[in-house]
Amino acid sequence: MKPQTRNTVVRMDPDTFFYDFYNRPILSDRNTVWLCYEVKMKTNDRSRPPLVAKILEGQVHFDPEHHAEMYFLSWFRGNLLQACKSSQITWFVSWNPCLNCVAKVAEFLAEHPNVTLTVSTARIYCYWKKDWRRALRKLCQTGARVKIMNYKEFAYCWENFVYKERKPFRYWDKFSGNYRFLRCKLQEILRHLMDPGTFTYNFTNDPSVLGRHQTYLCYEAEHLHSGTWVPLHQHRGFILNEASNNLSFPEGRHAELCLLDLISFWKLDPAQTYRVTCFISWSPCFSCAQEVAEFLHENPHVNLRIFAARIYDYRPGYEEGLLRLSWAGAPISMMKYSGFSHCWDTFVDHQGRSFKPWKGLNEHSQALSGRLQAILQIMGN
């Protein structure tokens, strides 16, 4: 389907702008998504303008094909991509992108490192729902900049995308309060701290636990500078495996592979050296261990350390997978008290409370460490 494109000659009606870009945090019956965009380009084709600015209209529809973000990607690939040496894309959207659109945007940015994206949204869609909060985090993790539209950006859209008849932009009642709320809410979402109960439930290192079907993975990256590892705070957070009912991954995707996706999105400098440390609730399965090993072979500038709370032994071949990781230069160890405490301090919304170990933590850690060493020794022989 071709995008329904409206250029800046035929602008948006003022009433439409005020109705659909109204920044009240909770709104109903706003089923149209407006995407006003600008593309600043560097190109060898002098016949092309350095700045393209237009409007796309999409629907909050179950079929992602009808989303404005998908229209834009289709339009950009078909019209500008081949001619661009580099481009800076800015979106001004009435609603932030959904998880499926974020996945497509992530693929697009990974495929085209010469493209940057800034998303300024008037509102956050269903900010209380986990999937939509995760969509915002994933969008940032891909390298896109996400922000709440402020007064200057509303005024800019009014000047460039609205048929205003020389009337200045006038903000509505409670505009500033709505903006402050949404800005704080976005910061809260992107801070991405785990609930204490979620951490304790999923990271308990009792090997006999049942019902822990999800894998949680906390990660932090460092850059080697003058012989010292310097934290990269922008590359820190936690992820979990993608459910099999997700449109982007019909068969599901394990947390380890999601981490590899993230590292690729970071666009790390191959001439530098980086270290990624992950704390994971289950050790990698054989298939994930293989893919991690291949990734490290293809990206020698990235080092990986893995600390696991428990050993995942539900599928055959897990022992070989653990050995494969060791051979690939990704040493795996079992989490100890210090690791659990570090995760609590770094990745959990602990509200100032210190980490309290659960019963048997040290005993389980020692037993699992002994079992891991035995596996590596036996398989190595």
From Swiss-Prot:
Region of interest (Interaction with DNA), residue spans: 210-212, 310-317
Cofactor dependence: Zn(2+)
Binding site for Zn(2+) 2: H254, C285, C288
GO cellular component: cytoplasm; nucleus; P-body; ribonucleoprotein complex
Phosphothreonine PTM positions: T32, T215
GO terms classed as biological process: cytidine deamination; cytidine to uridine editing; defense response to virus; DNA cytosine deamination; innate immune response; negative regulation of single stranded viral RNA replication via double stranded DNA intermediate; transposable element silencing
This protein's UniProt keywords: Antiviral defense, Cytoplasm, Hydrolase, Immunity, Innate immunity, Metal-binding, Nucleus, Phosphoprotein, Repeat, Zinc
Pfam families named among the record's database cross-references: NAD2
CDD domains the record matches: cytidine_deaminase
InterPro entries noted in UniProt: APOBEC/CMP_deaminase_Zn-bd, APOBEC_Cyt_Deaminase, CMP_dCMP_dom, Cytidine_deaminase-like
Catalysed reactions listed for this entry: a 2'-deoxycytidine in single-stranded DNA + H2O + H(+) = a 2'-deoxyuridine in single-stranded DNA + NH4(+)
Annotated region described as Essential for cytoplasmic localization, given as residue ranges: 1-62
Necessary for homooligomerization as annotated region, ranges: 206-333
Annotated positions for site Interaction with DNA: N241
Description of its domains: The CMP/dCMP deaminase domain 1 mediates RNA binding, RNA-dependent oligomerization and virion incorporation whereas the CMP/dCMP deaminase domain 2 confers deoxycytidine deaminase activity and substrate sequence specificity.
Protein name: DNA dC->dU-editing enzyme APOBEC-3G
Species per Swiss-Prot/TrEMBL record: Saguinus labiatus (Red-chested mustached tamarin)
Lineage: Eukaryota, Metazoa, Chordata, Craniata, Vertebrata
Gene encoding the protein: APOBEC3G
